[in-house]
């Protein structure tokens, strides 16, 4: 998935502190608005609880206060990926091969920006998703947003 320059810089800046605490940095989102939000997703083999989120928030806040990479006021949110886990990297798609995913594309493919189907394969920077019985191939750089679709 194509990250913005700011998101790339933030990812580079906070990966080491998050991993030093024993967590995986799943990904980040910076949402601009009246009140901007920096959302950080973390995970671990044992799952994530509120204390884990607080620990990461404290550590990341200290790094961001020193580096000051964001020029606007923002709220920091740290959470687990949840059931509708966001997908950020080729590794995420490979890890959840066989699962259902909802995609929003930056540029339409076949006049559609929204797609939903089963992750079939990952090949470098391309993913294959089976949509209504037909395989569709998408460039990760064209995926604006992707989430697993939970089934209950």
From Swiss-Prot:
Gene Ontology cellular component terms for the protein in this record: cytosol
Pfam families: DUF150_C, RimP_N
Signal peptide: none
Keyword Phosphoprotein found: no
Cysteine pairings via disulfide bonds: none
Keyword Cytoplasm: yes
GO terms classed as biological process: ribosomal small subunit assembly; translation
CDD domains: YlxS_C
Keywords for this protein: Cytoplasm, Ribosome biogenesis
Chief location of this protein within or outside the cell: cytoplasm
Entry's localization field: Cytoplasm
Top-level division of the source organism's lineage: Bacteria
InterPro entries: Ribosome_maturation_RimP, RimP_C, RimP_C_sf, RimP_N, RimP_N_sf
UniProt record similarity statement: Belongs to the RimP family.
Summary of the function given for this chain in its UniProt record: Required for maturation of 30S ribosomal subunits.
NCBIfam families per record: PRK00092.1-1 (NF000927)
Protein name: Ribosome maturation factor RimP
Species of provenance: Salmonella arizonae (strain ATCC BAA-731 / CDC346-86 / RSK2980)
Protein encoded by which gene: rimP
